[in-house]
Amino acid sequence: MGTKFPKASQALAQDPTTRRIWYGIATANDFETNDGITEENLYQKIFASHFGHLAIIFLWTSGNLFHVAWQGNFEQWVKDPLNTRPIAHAISDPHFGQRAIEAFSQAGASSPVNISYSGVYQWWYTQGMRTNEELYNGAIFLLILSALSLFAGWLHLQPKFRPNLSWFKNAESRLNHHLGGLFGTSSLAWTGHIVHVAIPESRGQHVGWDNFLQVAPHPAGLQPFFTGNWGVYTENPDTANHVFGSSDGAGTAILTFLGGFHPQTQSLWLTDIAHHHLAIAVLFIVAGHMYRTNFGIGHSIKEILNGHRPPGGRLGAGHVGLYDTVNNSLHFQLGLALAALGVITSLVAQHMYSIPPYAYLARDFTTQAALYTHHQYIAGFLMVGAFAHGAIFLVRDYDAEQNKNNVLARIIDHKEAIISHLSWVSLFLGFHTLGLYVHNDVVQAFGTPEKQILIEPVFAQWIQSVHGKSLYGFEVLLNNADSITRVAPGSAQPIWLPGWLDAINSGNNSLFLTIGPGDFLVHHAIALGLHTTTLILVKGALDARGSKLMPDKKDFGYSFPCDGPGRGGTCDISAWDAFYLAVFWMLNTIGWTTFYWHWKHLGVWQGNVAQFNESSTYLMGWFRDYLWLNSSQLINGYNPFGMNNLSVWAWMFLFGHLIWATGFMFLISWRGYWQELIETLVWAHERTPLANLVRWKDKPVALSIVQARLVGLAHFAVGYIVTYAAFLIASTASKFG
């Protein structure tokens, strides 16, 4: 008989029950626990898997390009972006009747198609693509990259091409390479593409493989660059009357500092974007030459960390020992990377709608809503993952001897203070915010809405004014015509981005939306969610090695289950349990965030901000005027009289609820119930003629507590997000197309 799954663990492979299968899947990526693994082998496996990851990403983006080129309407959309709905791909579904075929044959298509709400049309158009042929070329190029990545992954698993452990531990070289080689050079390359291809295309000048060596991106060529007269490249920008994609009103500038938006496309000026990426490229290429490698010059990170000790002694040993702690722990490194990526992903969500970089994205409301929600949920998962790996670091990699009295040890030493402060903040926010909402609900219900407690967010309004919003009457900084931030001393010439002040005060974009009492309340509800999620995650990580109830968690690992009443009961005190509970809070917090964003924007887009302002100050307003009112199209998505192109979203809305509700079956029942049920079914099966001819290799047993919680959590999360995705897209698309 061949070896059983999982090959990486013989102990698990010999388990006679179905536990073998589930634990094999659960630990599939936990290379550290594999049989015969060495530290070097672990690093090599993870390194090679990165190439597989890249291959999947390239294949996926290639598929996007290919399907739009094959089944989409990119060339028609380019001719009239505001009035053409972009097609993602065709639908070939045997379940469709004639009515469905008619309903989904939309956007000028002759057969059923899906509408694209991902923003790829706007993205490709902005970066200079105009024809299906260019999309096909991109798809083929990415396929080749995908194949090369797969080959590279295979190659780096071969004995001659496996990097050794010291190569992986060389932090300075890796930093130089990632900062200068990856971030810096790729930003420079992107600047080059914008300057050489995208900006000329936006001015009606096609640049392709046939002529890119003949078309100079600027009439002055490289002379200003070499003579230091760089200001020439900022002169003569596109005018406010510029028609995107043509030479009407076009200028010649390639690097500008205009601020605000292109009046026609309502997106950032391409010349501003090019300038931004050039600045990033310069910064990162410089940063990529800062760290000491072969030549004995530059910074040593270890020396910097060891020297970073305040003279007053208030940080104890400071950062001594941290270099080796971080450099020898993959979980610490992954935690840092996930936290940084989580923040950046949330920033992408905020900036995609407030300062849209792609032409006409600001006019495609459903896509804006989809992109915001998509990026916020991804940010949430990345962030809880950061804390999970922080906890695993403390369980598996943390060495107290190596970190005596340094900043990390001191955080662990006063974890009670950190946890209790977070607890206090969460309680304060929770009671006060809910108290205000409930008070407002009661007075609304009793017919005295004038008795609501409505608080103007004056500090936030002041901050908006600082950035130039004039509505609130605070004359400060950018909202003060005499301020040094507006006008350089001794000149009447404004030094700020000239287009910024027009944009922030225009009212037809999402820059610094006008805020009032409803915003004040929901801001604090979101703050409650963020602080409570953080409390659970921080407590779970800081207590990962030991807590008041159970000071000896080290040998129990990251994800031990309830352990009976022996140590006073150990339910919900493993680091995994904290992660599990935090995910529910994370999902709810992002729920509130996306509800707020969507409802606020529906009012802005429809030109009716009064509904949000009046109804968002009490809970029934949210339930009735946001959730119920906007789900009515979905609840009636298909009925005895027929269906429409929202029917698939209506079905998905129901199906999402079903997946979500299924999660509770795993979350609310205890393991014994299922084990009893399985034993009964096994007994009946073995005594049923014919049926008992079928045998199993693994004895069926109930899921463990941790596994059932994971399955329940997965259903809860997937159902929750699928339900809201259907609601969001259908309610927005039904209003704006």
UniProtKB/Swiss-Prot annotation:
Can you tell which superkingdom this protein's organism belongs to?
A: Eukaryota
Tell me the InterPro entries matching this sequence: PSI_PsaA/B (IPR001280), PSI_PsaA/B_CS (IPR020586), PSI_PsaA/B_sf (IPR036408), PSI_PsaB (IPR006244)
| Quaternary structure and interacting proteins, as annotated | The PsaA/B heterodimer binds the P700 chlorophyll special pair and subsequent electron acceptors. PSI consists of a core antenna complex that captures photons, and an electron transfer chain that converts photonic excitation into a charge separation. The eukaryotic PSI reaction center is composed of at least 11 subunits.
Source species taxonomy: Eukaryota, Glaucocystophyceae, Cyanophoraceae, Cyanophora
Query: Do you know which SUPFAM superfamilies this protein is assigned to?
Result: Photosystem I subunits PsaA/PsaB
Q: Which residues bind [4Fe-4S] cluster?
A: C562, C571
Q: What is its EC number?
A: 1.97.1.12
PANTHER family per the UniProt record, alphabetical: OUTER MEMBRANE PROTEIN, OMPA-RELATED (PTHR30128), PHOTOSYSTEM I P700 CHLOROPHYLL A APOPROTEIN A1-RELATED (PTHR30128:SF19)
| Protein function | PsaA and PsaB bind P700, the primary electron donor of photosystem I (PSI), as well as the electron acceptors A0, A1 and FX. PSI is a cytochrome c6-ferredoxin oxidoreductase, converting photonic excitation into a charge separation, which transfers an electron from the donor P700 chlorophyll pair to the spectroscopically characterized acceptors A0, A1, FX, FA and FB in turn. Oxidized P700 is reduced on the lumenal side of the thylakoid membrane by cytochrome c6.
Catalytic reaction annotation: reduced [plastocyanin] + hnu + oxidized [2Fe-2S]-[ferredoxin] = oxidized [plastocyanin] + reduced [2Fe-2S]-[ferredoxin]
- Alphabetized UniProt keyword annotations: 4Fe-4S, Chlorophyll, Chromophore, Cyanelle, Electron transport, Iron, Iron-sulfur, Magnesium, Membrane, Metal-binding, Oxidoreductase, Photosynthesis, Photosystem I, Plastid, Thylakoid, Transmembrane, Transmembrane helix, Transport
How this chain sits in the membrane, per its record, is:
Multi-pass membrane protein
An annotated GO cellular component: chloroplast thylakoid membrane
Record keyword Iron-sulfur present:
yes
Can you tell me which residues bind chlorophyll a B3? M665, Y673
Give binding positions for chlorophyll a B1.
Answer: H657
GO terms classed as biological process:
photosynthesis
Annotated PROSITE patterns: PHOTOSYSTEM_I_PSAAB (PS00419)
To which species is this protein native?
Cyanophora paradoxa
Q: Which residues bind phylloquinone?
A: W674
Which cell locations does it reside in?
Answer: Plastid, Cyanelle thylakoid membrane
The record's remark on the cofactor is:
P700 is a chlorophyll a/chlorophyll a' dimer, A0 is one or more chlorophyll a, A1 is one or both phylloquinones and FX is a shared 4Fe-4S iron-sulfur center.
Q: Which GO terms describe its molecular function?
A: 4 iron, 4 sulfur cluster binding; chlorophyll binding; electron transfer activity; magnesium ion binding; oxidoreductase activity
Q: Which Gene3D superfamilies match?
A: Photosystem I PsaA/PsaB
Q: Which family does it belong to?
A: Belongs to the PsaA/PsaB family.
From the Swiss-Prot or TrEMBL record, give the protein name: Photosystem I P700 chlorophyll a apoprotein A2
Q: Where is the chain membrane-spanning?
A: 46-69, 135-158, 175-199, 273-291, 330-353, 369-395, 417-439, 520-538, 578-599, 646-668, 710-730
